[in-house]
């Protein structure tokens, strides 16, 4: 949109906002005022050419959009079906209000958190996302270097475009490994032995996407990229053949195996629990019933997740599901959450509802796609800074002090 068009639109909205006729209708006036604010934000947010110019994580979105190939961009931003769950994830934050306590010392706000015995500089972690080289040539290594600089936990996807060994070296400590369980137990063992040998002690079994998905936007846009990056799109979506060239499948016997086992059940979880000697998290649960089963089956943690709205069109936000999962485990195991987090205040709300740590996905991919390591680093800097502001303004000096008393929630009971 040209500068002259933006200016004309701004002046028209200002004219409407000042009109006594519009003012007579409160709803219309509010709508027009929102338009003025949105227009001002759009003008202020010219596409950034330097990550240092970013004020919020949203500033990276258009910058990344202009650099990332169309099919890869569609893969990053789209959900499933009508993308309703993506919208639900964001809309939930507007339903949770902060309840600040005043007259409290905010000179020393500590956002550090300990997760399974390791201290991180904040409760914000980087979610597993597959094939990060599709967004920037340095891919997972750029993300790892930024995570190291910011003292941040990094998950690594089974669908990574960089090996776990390389990422661990760049990060300076082991990642938490997100595990897509193949339909062959032998393949599971081979992959997990490699992960263990690389020094990883935490595995997150993903359970919310075992039968595939309908990603409409991605599927319609992907053919535009085939001439430019055919290596990224081998085989049919979801088939094991699509992933055999990825690093974590090298040396793994996937003959006749599916990338994810559609027959996976709690008996499989028990078998995995007996085999894996480290910490085992289940990623993708969002009900109290499944949370209680985690306790029965010896699981060490739960990641409340709907795959960023990319698995099942539940139309239910992870922030809404979080309280019932937290209540079900009653402090016996930690609960983590991801899905739609864009602000430090969003993170604060999840911590108040009982999350131990909070994951981000698309925001750091925007940073990666726009500026590589520097973009990811700035995204983390912004969110950590916003979290400090939210904590200080609400009267909390440490993450441990953030409780349900600091938020007001709607009736989300089932």
Identify what each model region corresponds to.
Residues 2-20:
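N-terminal secretory signal peptides and thylakoid transit peptides that target proteins
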Residues 120-157:
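Glycine-rich active-site/cofactor-binding loop and its immediate structural neighborhood
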């Amino acid at each position: 949109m040209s500068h002259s068009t933006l200016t004309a639109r701004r002046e028209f909205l200002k004219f409407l906002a000042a009109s006594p006729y519009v003012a007579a209708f409160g709803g219309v006036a509010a709508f027009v005022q929102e338009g003025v604010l949105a227009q001002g934000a759009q003008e202020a947010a010219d596409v950034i050419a330097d990550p240092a110019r970013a004020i919020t994580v949203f500033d990276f979105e258009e910058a990344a959009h202009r650099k990332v190939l169309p099919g890869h961009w569609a893969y990053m931003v789209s959900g499933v079906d009508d993308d309703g769950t993506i919208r639900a994830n964001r809309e939930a934050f507007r339903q949770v209000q902060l309840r600040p306590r005043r007259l409290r010392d905010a000179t020393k706000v500590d956002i550090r958190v300990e997760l399974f015995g390791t201290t991180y500089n904040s409760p914000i972690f980087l979610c597993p996302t597959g094939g990060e080289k599709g967004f920037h040539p340095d891919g997972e290594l750029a993300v790892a270097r930024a995570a190291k600089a910011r003292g941040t936990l990094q998950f690594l996807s089974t669908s990574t475009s960089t090996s776990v060994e390389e990422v661990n070296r760049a990060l300076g400590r082991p990642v938490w490994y997100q595990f897509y369980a193949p339909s062959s137990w032998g393949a599971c063992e081979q992959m997990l032995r490699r992960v263990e040998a690389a020094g990883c002690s935490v595995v997150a079994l993903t359970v919310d996407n075992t039968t595939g998905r309908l990603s409409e936007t991605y599927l319609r846009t992907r053919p535009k990229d085939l001439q430019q990056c055919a290596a990224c799109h081998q085989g049919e979506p979801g088939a094991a053949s699509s992933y055999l060239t990825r690093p974590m499948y090298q040396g793994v016997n996937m003959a006749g195996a599916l990338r994810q086992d559609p027959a996976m059940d709690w008996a499989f979880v028990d078998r995995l629990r007996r085999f894996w000697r480290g910490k085992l998290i289940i990623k993708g649960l969002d009900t109290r019933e499944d949370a209680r089963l985690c306790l029965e089956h010896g699981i060490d943690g739960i990641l409340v997740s709907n795959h960023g709205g990319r698995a099942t069109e539940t139309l239910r936000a992870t922030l809404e599901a979080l309280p019932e999962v937290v209540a079900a485990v009653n402090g016996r195991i930690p609960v983590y959450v991801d899905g739609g987090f864009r602000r430090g205040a969003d993170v604060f709300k999840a911590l108040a509802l009982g999350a131990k740590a909070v994951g981000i996905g698309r925001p750091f991919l925007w940073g990666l796609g726009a500026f590589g390591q520097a973009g990811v680093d700035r995204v983390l800097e912004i969110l950590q800074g916003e979290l400090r502001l939210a904590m200080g303004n609400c009267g909390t000096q440490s993450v441990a002090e953030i409780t349900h008393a600091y938020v007001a929630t709607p009736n989300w009971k089932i």
